[in-house]
């Protein structure tokens, strides 16, 4: 997805269209319910996540909202990983 986002940002940038992607980690959604409803699995994930917790849908929503404001005016071609720092502890 990173290269697609970059290519589209280059193609659409001259038309003042910004292209970014959000790459969420483990977020408390129905999709991940099996993991976050099991206290043992939740603790295992929290131990290896630098921020020490699972993500909440609001975490994604707030990032999305900020990208749609003036705060995101000069941001394009980026894939933003929002995972509580998990990727930096295990980039695989």
Q: Predicted segment positions?
A:
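Short, flexible catalytic-loop segment of classical short-chain dehydrogenase/reductase
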Residues: 23-34
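A short C-terminal helix-loop "cap" of Rossmann-like NAD(P)-dependent dehydrogenase/epimerase domains
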Residues: 35-49
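Rossmann-like NAD(H)/NADP(H) cofactor-binding core
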Residues: 15, 20, 78
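Alpha-helical segment proximal to the catalytic Tyr-Lys
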Residues: 10-14, 73
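Short C-terminal tail/terminal secondary-structure segment
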Residues: 65, 76-92
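Conserved catalytic helix of short-chain dehydrogenase/reductases
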Residues: 1-11
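Short-chain dehydrogenase/reductase
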Residues: 5-6, 61-64, 68
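A conserved structural motif in NAD(P)-dependent oxidoreductases
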Residues: 49-60, 71
């Amino acid at each position: 997805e990173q290269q697609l986002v970059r290519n589209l940002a280059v193609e659409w940038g001259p038309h003042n269209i910004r292209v970014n992607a959000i790459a969420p980690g483990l977020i408390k959604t129905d999709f991940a319910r099996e993991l976050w409803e099991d206290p043992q699995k939740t603790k295992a994930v929290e131990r290896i996540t630098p921020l020490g917790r699972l993500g909440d849908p609001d975490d994604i929503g707030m990032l999305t909202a900020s990208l749609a404001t003036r705060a995101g005016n000069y941001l394009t071609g980026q894939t933003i990983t929002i995972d509580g720092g998990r990727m930096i502890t295990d980039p695989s």
